[in-house]
Swiss-Prot record:
Keyword set, alphabetical order: Electron transport, Heme, Iron, Membrane, Metal-binding, Mitochondrion, Mitochondrion inner membrane, Respiratory chain, Transmembrane, Transmembrane helix, Transport, Ubiquinone
GO molecular function: metal ion binding; ubiquinol-cytochrome-c reductase activity
Binding annotation for heme b b562: 83, 182
Bilayer topology annotation: Multi-pass membrane protein
GO cellular component: mitochondrial inner membrane; respiratory chain complex III
GO biological process: mitochondrial electron transport, ubiquinol to cytochrome c
Protein name, entry field: Cytochrome b
Classification via CDD domains: cytochrome_b_C, Cytochrome_b_N
Pfam families tied to this protein: Cytochrom_B_C, Cytochrome_B
Cofactor(s), by name: heme b
Outcome when changing residue 356 to I: In strain: Isolate 3
UniProt subcellular location: Mitochondrion inner membrane
Chain segments annotated as transmembrane: 33-53, 77-98, 113-133, 178-198, 226-246, 288-308, 320-340, 347-367
Length: 379
């Protein structure tokens, strides 16, 4: 009798994706982050669903409803903090996942990579709108500043901003629509993630050595199911520690002050995972220039495959490129730190230098390093 998991229409899809999937035998822990992102997404959808049952998207009651969730709803505080800190874990996994793709040349799987970039933009949009919902000071002013960036678009900018706001400032209409979008987007992310996996399974996964592994494949189950389960356990352990010991570590104290349009906080800044892009935005004095730099700082990932000059796929055997990669990682940490600092000397110049270095490494130095390494390998 044929095994039901190989014949049943639904079970067959699961079988081909999670059980009998041929996987390279040498993929390291850096390949765990894809499944961890799946765990984060499911966790966010579940905690978000329970929060939505008690949240009210009205400017007069939004802040109070969050207080109500934390004080009166049974285990509401843990659901709220798991959702808020779950977003931070989501972005840590995202950055690791993208970094892995850059390091090992996974961007050469172009369809998977491009869907990944769309996913990154969608997750960033979702997180931004989620940050507006508690209707604290940073929620309100963050929404005002970031949506206002669209006014830099020539001709239609001002009308576009008012259309998004649903009025002449961030108001009740803005909050309601942001809640609606924040609720629907994770399901769009789920669909995009399925397409991401579909394209990945068309070509098969990359591996640390960067050479084809068709001659050396092992079944996904039990080898990588147990490995992913361990990764998920560690992720939940870190998240639990964060939620139970210091839930406000990554948040902003200003968000415990109800939104007040008449009082601007001394330093408006987004959540920590957007600070690198925010620093790039602020490093350019011109508004439109800043917005373009902000968009291009993420969109630059789309042209990375075109800038690949090396004969080798990954950076495993390319010391020059490795140095540049870790310089890029340090540069992003510097930008993240600068994004959280006030706009004054010496932070302005540090931010500008770090921004220039970011684009220089990706657009100029890495392609040159690839060519140099090609020539060195001939010796």
């Amino acid at each position: 009798m044929t095994n039901i998991r190989k014949t049943h229409p639904l079970a067959k899809i699961i079988n081909n994706s999670l059980i009998d999937l041929p996987a390279p035998s040498n993929i390291s822990a850096w390949w765990n982050f894809g499944s961890l992102l799946g765990v984060c997404l499911v966790l966010q959808i579940l905690t978000g669903l329970f929060l939505a049952m008690h949240y009210t998207s009205d400017t007069t009651t939004a802040f109070s409803s969050i207080t109500h969730i934390c004080r009166d709803v049974h285990y509401g505080w843990i659901i709220r903090y798991m959702h808020a800190n779950g977003a931070s874990m989501f972005f840590i996994c995202l950055f690791m996942h993208v970094g892995r793709g850059l390091y090992y040349g996974s961007y050469l799987l172009s369809e998977t990579w491009n869907i990944g970039i769309i996913l990154l933009f969608t997750v960033m949009a979702t997180a931004f709108m989620g940050y507006v919902l508690p209707w604290g000071q940073m929620s309100f002013w963050g929404a005002t500043v970031i949506t206002n960036l669209l006014s830099a678009i020539p001709y239609i900018g001002a009308d576009l901003v008012e259309w998004i706001w649903g009025g002449f400032s961030v108001n009740k209409a803005t909050l309601t629509r942001f809640f609606a979008f924040h609720f629907i987007l994770p399901f769009i992310i789920l669909t995009l993630a399925a397409v991401h996996l579909l394209f990945l399974h068309e070509t098969g996964s990359n591996n640390p050595s960067g050479i084809p592994s068709d001659s050396d494949k092992i079944p996904f189950h039990p080898y990588y199911t147990i490995k992913d389960a361990l990764g998920a356990l560690l992720l939940i352990l870190v998240l639990a520690a964060l939620v139970l010991f210091s839930p406000d570590l990554l948040g902003d104290p200003d968000n415990y002050i109800p939104a007040n349009p008449l009082s601007t906080p001394p330093h408006i800044k987004p959540e920590w995972y957007f600070l690198f892009a925010y620093a790039i935005l602020r490093s350019i004095p011109n508004k439109l220039g800043g917005v373009l730099a902000l968009i291009f700082s993420i969109l630059i990932l789309a042209i990375i495959p075109l800038l690949h000059t090396s004969k080798q796929r990954g950076m495993m055997f390319r010391p020059l490129s490795q140095c540049l990669f870790w310089l890029l990682a340090a540069d992003l940490l510097t930008l993240t730190w600068i994004g959280g600092q006030p706009v004054e000397h010496p932070f302005i110049i540090i931010g500008q230098l770090a921004s220039v270095l970011y684009f220089t490494i990706l657009l100029v130095l890495m392609p040159i390093a690839g060519i140099i390494e090609n020539n060195l390998s001939k010796w």
